[in-house]
Curated annotation (Swiss-Prot):
Signal peptide limits: none
Domain notes: There are 3 contiguous domains conserved in the CDPK subfamily: a kinase domain, an autoinhibitory (junction) domain and a calmodulin-like domain. The autoinhibitory domain (356-386) inactivates kinase activity under calcium-free conditions.
Active-site residues (renumbered): D216
List of residues binding ATP: L98, G99, Q100, G101, Q102, F103, G104, T105, T106, K121
GO biological process: intracellular signal transduction
Name of protein: Calcium-dependent protein kinase 5
Organism: Oryza sativa subsp. japonica
Family membership: Belongs to the protein kinase superfamily. Ser/Thr protein kinase family. CDPK subfamily.
UniProt KW Signal keyword: no
Domain Protein kinase: 92-350
EC number of this enzyme: 2.7.11.1
Amino acid sequence: MGNTCGVTLRSKYFASFRGASQRHDEAGYAPVATSAAAAAAADEPAGKKAPRGSAAAADAPHAASMKRGAPAPAELTANVLGHPTPSLSEHYALGRKLGQGQFGTTYLCTDLATGVDYACKSIAKRKLITKEDVEDVRREIQIMHHLAGHRNVVAIKGAYEDPQYVHIVMELCAGGELFDRIIERGQFSERKAAELTRIIVGVIEACHSLGVIHRDLKPENFLLANKDDDLSLKAIDFGLSVFFKPGQVFTDVVGSPYYVAPEVLRKCYGPEADVWTAGVILYILLSGVPPFWAETQQGIFDAVLKGVIDFDSDPWPVISDSAKDLIRRMLNPRPKERLTAHEVLCHPWICDHGVAPDRPLDPAVLSRIKQFSAMNKLKKMALRVIAESLSEEEIAGLKEMFKAMDTDNSGAITYDELKEGMRKYGSTLKDTEIRDLMEAADVDNSGTIDYIEFIAATLHLNKLEREEHLVAAFSYFDKDGSGYITVDELQQACKEHNMPDAFLDDVIKEADQDNDGRIDYGEFVAMMTKGNMGVGRRTMRNSLNISMR
């Protein structure tokens, strides 16, 4: 991750794909996937206690990122923090798993002295492959300490290191995600949106004033510390954040498609990109949809670069002119003309006792937010089903390719094997771009690509071209073979994949084109092939420059 102008490509375009087979699910080698529990157990810190308690929290997955440079020297990974630390187990007891990230897993943990619960992110040191990986972990901890004391930034309690892991103990955010809370409330107003935006932009202002760019702002990275307090919002996940100096230019492509600023796509940006992203979040808060939307990832990029904002469709005719003025200023495509975080906080619509109306927004906006959040969850689950249901005949070519790359016949492709294999297939990718693909396909965060991961990656990135894949997924959900997917069947599938089943009614409504309360095959295909859940310019398929059929 560069602080200077060296051209690298670091994108989160597989964040959604990673969730397709996994946010919480893992796959194993064979042609048959292993269980999620077994795979997860393989990456748990030694001494982890059995699951206990029911406190809820989440740690947004680290972005799939592209690394530069040579492998990390052994002395670096042996001593990531650069100084000795006490043993984590002397002070905390690990509990149940809360979330899975790019480099590690977050657990509930309890302070042995006080009984207070915290969240502990355990980062597997074996996944810190390059010197930049090690520097990223150090910098994340440094930035969390640097921002300590801000009431809307998750508080770090301490960092610990043992031979296998780096552990970051932090404040537990048990209130859930921002959008989930909005949906739960059932009522939302411009004034409430102004209050939340004031918090989000306040975090940005604090970061920028302390020389930090967050670079990964999105609703999932704002959690509520307390489910009973709508304003207990906390910014989390500083894994992509960087220190900056005034005038410094960054070229790393990071972010998610809906939220990425145009100058990030152009690989020349600074702290202004955070304000753009906050503007996108505000637009979604008020309308339930992102301002830059298209059926494909490239279409989204084109829309972002074009910068045309829709204020004509519902509900915008009844949204205040002041709100629209603020959004226009936050989404100014010219970074130097965009409002700064401080200027946003001084805008009449957002400041204390400002002009934001208190009347409830159209209920349709809440519905759209629910659909925007829930639909991806079903797609992700379906993609895993497809990857695990392929027959030997269907994947014979891919299996041979996997075997050709797996030169030591270990059942997993290492970074070096992938790099050599890509070049054998005529790829001209830079090492950093290959690293990005490696991390994208490694859904179980093992540091290698196993058989099912390879198949799942090529299937997803091939945009589900084979109809039989879709038939297999549809049949999986259609438990009774009726030709329709019902809410009950989706609930059962969610249980099987350890996924939340909230808002499935909204998934049905979104896909149900004939309004009969269920999803037929045609509607399912339309849902699965609409849009794209990932972002990025490189895929395993087009990088190999061969047919994946």
